[in-house]
Amino acid sequence: GVADCTAQLAQALGGLLQPSDALVCPWRNDGHPDHEATGHACAEVARQVGCRLLELPIWTWHWATPEDPQVPWHRAAALALAPEQLALKRQALACFHSQLLPDPSTGKEAILPAWATARLLRPFEVVFV
């Protein structure tokens, strides 16, 4: 998983970022090990570089409630997406066949049900700033 290569991820990102950049990543306490490892690596890089960090709750929506004290709702902001941005997001999501289609080798349903993909394709993003 990503946890095995966070040092490489941090090194690669650190070489690309400037203090004036914004680094967008999964929230570091999202509840998925790859999301969390990526989020922690990005948070450290943002701290070192001095750039802005925007964290996205992804799996958080599956387990948290609006009152959940584990989630930094006080840091949440909604960013509206332009139609072109939403179209690009739709294209990107369509690339994740392993998440969207049933697994023929196991017979298991898609990992992301229709209600989850609908949430991913809202015309705004919630970010923790």
Regions from the language model: what does each represent?
Residues 33-35, 57-60, 105-108:
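A short linear-motif detector with a strong N-terminal bias
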Residues 1-52, 87, 91-95, 109-111, ...:
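Active-site beta-strand->loop->alpha-helix modules in alpha/beta enzyme cores, enriched
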Residues 27, 59-63, 73, 115:
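A residue-identity detector for tryptophan
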Residues 48-70:
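Short, flexible loop segments at boundaries between secondary-structure elements
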Residues 53-54, 79, 125:
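A broad, low-specificity signal marking well-ordered, structured residues that form hydrophobic/aromatic
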Residues 65-109:
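A conserved mid-domain beta-alpha-beta active-site/ligand-binding segment of alpha/beta enzyme cores
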Residues 100-129:
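C-terminal and late-domain segments of enzyme folds
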